[in-house]
Structure formats: C-alpha cells, structure tokens
Amino acid sequence: MGLSVIILAAGQGKRMASSTPKILHPLGGIPLLERVVNTARLLNPHTIHVVYGNGGSHVREKLNYLPVHWIEQSQQLGTGHAVLQAIPFCQNEDRVLILYGDVPLISPKTLNSLLENTPSNGLGVVVAELPDPTGLGRIIRDDFGNILSIVEHKDVAEHQLKIREINTGIMTTTAMNLKKWLPQLNNNNCQKEYYLTDTVALAVAEGCPVGGVAAQCCEEVQGVNDRWELTKLERYYQRLMAKKLSLAGVTIIDPERFDARGENIEIAPDVVIDVNVILEGNVQLDRNVRIGPNVILKNTTVGENTEIHANSVIEAAVIKANCSVGPFARLRPGSVLEEGAKVGNFVEMKKTTLGRGSKANHLTYLGDTIIGKNVNVGAGTITCNYDGANKWQTKIEDGAFIGSNVALVAPLTVGKNATIGAGSTLSQDAPPDQLTVARERQRTIKGWHRPTKKE
C-alpha cells in the first residue's frame, strides 16, 4: 500500500486582507504551502497532490519548483469537493493522507503516529483539545469514547458547544473508501458546502474503524486565517528555533528578538547571537562566531572566531575564520573575506575578494575587485567599476598600501607592495614596489581674497 498525500490549498483567505494568496505568505521565511509540502515529503509518499484555487496560476508560478501534482478547484464548494478533485488520481489501494496548506507546523511525528495507528481499512483523524474551540469543528463521541461524527462549528447544537475536543481536518483513510464516500456527501448545512468531515459519519455507519490521534500541541495544528494568527504562529516558531539552537550550545541573548527565516540554518556550539539578528536562507556559522545586534545574514557562511559587529547587512557572502566585519558594513553578493581579513564601519563590498590579513577599515566601496593578502585599503577608497554601460575589475596585489581618499578607475592593477598616495585618482596600472601619486601639486595663490557680499 503506497502513500498518496492530498494538500488542500484552495481557500480564498479573505481575512488575510491581502492581494497575495494566503498560502504564499511566509512563516519563518518559507511560504505556508511549501512548509506543508516539505513535511509531507518526509513521509516518503509516491505522490503529493495540491488542490489549489485562489490565486490560480500565480500560486503555481511562484511555487513551480515544488515536486507536486497541481489540481485546480475552479469552484470552492467545500473540503469534500476539493478532495473529490484529487481522488481520481489516487490508486484504490493507496493510503491517502489529507493535509492543509494553511496549517504549516504539523509535525512528521504526529503524522507518522496517525498513519501507524489507523487500521489499514479504517479512518483516522488528528484531534486536539483547546481551551477555546470557537470556530472549529467538534469531535462527537459516544459514551464509550468512540468517534461518531464531526460537526462543524456553524452546525453545532447548543449542547455541543461545551465540547473542547476539535477536529484539525487532518485525516487518513484509503482511496477506495474516499471514492465510495465522497459522492455521498451533500451540502445540507449552514455553509452550503460539501464537508470532508461528513465522511466520518459515513464510515461509522458502515462499521469502519474510526480513530483519533492527539496532536502534540495546539500550535502544530493551528491554521492561519488572518495576519494576527500568522504573527502569533511566527513568534511561536521563532521561539522553537531559538530553543533548539540554545539546547545545541548556541547563546541567544533574547529569544523574543531573534528570527530564523529558512530551513538550512546551521549554527555550531559557542556561537553568540545578540538581539534583533535575522538569519535568512542558507546560513552557516562556525564555532565561536559572535553576531552583534541588528545584523542581517542571508545565504552566508561565517568561519570560526569571526565577529560581525552591530548593524551589518550581509548577503551571499563567504567570511572565513578570524575575520571582523562592521559595524555598519554591507557585504553584497559575491563578497569573500579570506582568513583574518577586516572590514570596518561604512564599508560596502560587492563581487570582491579581500585577501588574507587585508583590511578596509572605513568609508570604502569595493566593487568587482580582487585584493591580495596583507593589503591596507585607506579610508574613503572607491573602486570606480562602472562606466555607465559595463562593469570592470580592479586588482590589488599582495602587500599594497592604498592611501586615504583614493579613486581607482577600473580596469587597472595595483602591483605587489605598491603604495598609492592619498587623494590620488588612478586610471592606469600602478607598478609594484613604487609610490604612485596622481593628484595636482598643492599651491597657494598669493593675494587672493574671499568674495564679499554686495551692499
């Protein structure tokens, strides 16, 4: 018996008050639907079907990299109708698992428990007990605790309102059962929709075993209906990430002011992360790295014993061991700092390699530049890499010394151990082991008087 997963993702999401389809809104930097797909893939299904509606082609275009079978529900007539669109693509003998694109934190552990504890011919649902179940379908049991049915909130009788055990919507049964039950559904309810939950009563009527598996926590089955619910779930997720990292040996100064936005974040023990740090995409921090406050790291690797000072923004960079960056530094994509390199305050780099032991400490722009080892780049140095049409490369060889306020008009090469005098503007190569100065000689104009205002 193979596993086929159906993810329902066709809801309109009106309460999000957004032009972006709800399932494309991110949690922890990843779209809600993508999170559910990633969890489903951990179960090794042979197929993942996604039933989509609201947002249509926009959803598919944005998430076209996902390994799923897309099925459009042109009319949103309820969850039962949505599953009916996908079930023809499932083999009769398949075990079908139904998930929701706006329930992003469901855990593989809970889903495995559901699959393992549901008889091969039975029906299983994930349930949860909430202090306030308002708006959610209730689990109706008999005097012996057996599940009889699920009643949606709008159809709940007054005496059932006190029930706090709710249906999460997550369900598993065979494809054959669903092919038999789904055509029997009707829309005789307050919402005039075909409820998937009505299959529970049909199963009970047939004598089919129906069981419930409890969620590990309320948050893992929390659906996202509006921005506030998403905000609360985001903070819960970030606390989980902070706890996980802390237990692995990472110091998080304040878990409430830490954000990890990506799946591939690897942090070694003895790393210290100060407040308001954002980690995005693929981030790797080696041992003894220190990240100052208000730092953004995106798709970046940082070597051991390196310190990133406050208010630095770093994207798609490689920073090797024993480096220092910032404060107020910006490293754009393609920046590489070799071991022991130093980038100081108000320095910007793009597509630039700063060699071993080299430093650019202040007020500098380095673009499309290859810098050797033990180079000193003085304050105010600018590589003029763009001529209005094309980008050009600057090369600064080992041991060079660039004075303050120097403009290097690419393409050019500064030779090994060359010295460039402060205030120079170079448009040609500077030879090695020589002092190159390109500025007008200082002069004083005698007898000059400052202009005065006319009376």
Curated annotation (Swiss-Prot):
Reactions catalysed, as given in the entry: alpha-D-glucosamine 1-phosphate + acetyl-CoA = N-acetyl-alpha-D-glucosamine 1-phosphate + CoA + H(+); N-acetyl-alpha-D-glucosamine 1-phosphate + UTP + H(+) = UDP-N-acetyl-alpha-D-glucosamine + diphosphate
An annotated GO BP: regulation of cell shape
Recorded superkingdom: Bacteria
Top EC class for this record: transferase
Keywords annotated in UniProt: Acyltransferase, Cell shape, Cell wall biogenesis/degradation, Cytoplasm, Magnesium, Metal-binding, Multifunctional enzyme, Nucleotidyltransferase, Peptidoglycan synthesis, Repeat, Transferase
Pfam families per UniProt: Hexapep, NTP_transf_3
GO molecular function, one term: UDP-N-acetylglucosamine diphosphorylase activity
Cofactor: binding comment: Binds 1 Mg(2+) ion per subunit.
Renumbered residue ranges of the record's region N-acetyltransferase: 249-455
Cofactor(s), names only, from the UniProt record: Mg(2+)
EC number, as in UniProt: 2.7.7.23, 2.3.1.157
Residues noted as binding acetyl-CoA in the record, renumbered to the chain: A379, N385, Y386, S404, A422, R439
Active-site residues, as the UniProt record annotates them: H362
This protein's pathway: Nucleotide-sugar biosynthesis; UDP-N-acetyl-alpha-D-glucosamine biosynthesis; N-acetyl-alpha-D-glucosamine 1-phosphate from alpha-D-glucosamine 6-phosphate (route II): step 2/2; Nucleotide-sugar biosynthesis; UDP-N-acetyl-alpha-D-glucosamine biosynthesis; UDP-N-acetyl-alpha-D-glucosamine from N-acetyl-alpha-D-glucosamine 1-phosphate: step 1/1; Bacterial outer membrane biogenesis; LPS lipid A biosynthesis
Region (Linker): 228-248
UniProt binding sites for UDP-N-acetyl-alpha-D-glucosamine: 8-11, 22, 73, 78-79, 100-102, 137, 152, 167, 225, 332, 350, 365, 376
Binding of Mg(2+), residues: D102, N225
Family per similarity comment: In the N-terminal section; belongs to the N-acetylglucosamine-1-phosphate uridyltransferase family. In the C-terminal section; belongs to the transferase hexapeptide repeat family.
Subunit: Homotrimer.
Protein name per the record: Bifunctional protein GlmU
Gene that produces this protein: glmU
